[in-house]
């Protein structure tokens, strides 16, 4: 059985090991509080479902939204460039090996950039499926 927490950890590990995203700059999942200074990231995992297609014992589908938060007094291009590099990193077809499963991004959707109080926010949603080994 694939555990949701293990899938979350594998996605984070893949992101932190292959980009300039600093794990110390990850605001808590779904957190509304973001400390001052520099680029910060917020993640929210959503839409976890388990299906049982004929060719696999089970499959987990879900998505994660990554928001890149940047102080509004800085050039917004920095957040946009980082959002694009994250999108490129998870671009299908890609197969990420986990403990007892394979993780495959299926679709990447850039979300509209916005301003929220003192933050510029560039976001994207990564849809994925996880298959047992």
Give residue spans per PLM region:
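Oligomerization/assembly interface segments of phage tail-like spikes and tubes
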Residues: 58-74, 119-131
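Short amphipathic alpha-helices in soluble, non-transmembrane regions
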Residues: 81-87
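Small/polar-rich, solvent-exposed N-terminal microdomains that initiate assembly or binding
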Residues: 1-56, 77, 88-89, 93-99, ...
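Short alpha-helix boundary/capping segments
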Residues: 74-81
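Generic short beta-strand segments
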Residues: 45-50, 108-109, 127-129
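Low-complexity, intrinsically disordered Gly/Pro/Thr-rich segments
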Residues: 102-115
């Amino acid at each position: 059985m694939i555990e949701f927490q293990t899938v979350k950890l594998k996605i984070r590990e893949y992101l932190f090991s292959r980009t300039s995203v600093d794990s110390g700059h990850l605001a808590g999942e779904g957190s509304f509080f973001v400390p001052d200074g520099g680029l910060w990231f917020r993640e929210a995992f959503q839409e976890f479902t388990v299906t049982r297609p004929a060719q696999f014992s089970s499959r987990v589908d879900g998505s994660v939204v990554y928001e890149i938060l940047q102080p509004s007094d800085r050039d917004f291009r920095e957040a946009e460039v980082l959002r694009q590099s994250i999108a490129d990193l998870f671009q299908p077809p890609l197969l990420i090996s986990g403990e007892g499963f394979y993780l495959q991004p299926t679709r990447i959707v850039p979300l509209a950039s916005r301003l929220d109080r003192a933050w510029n926010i560039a976001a994207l949603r990564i849809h994925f499926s996880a298959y047992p080994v």
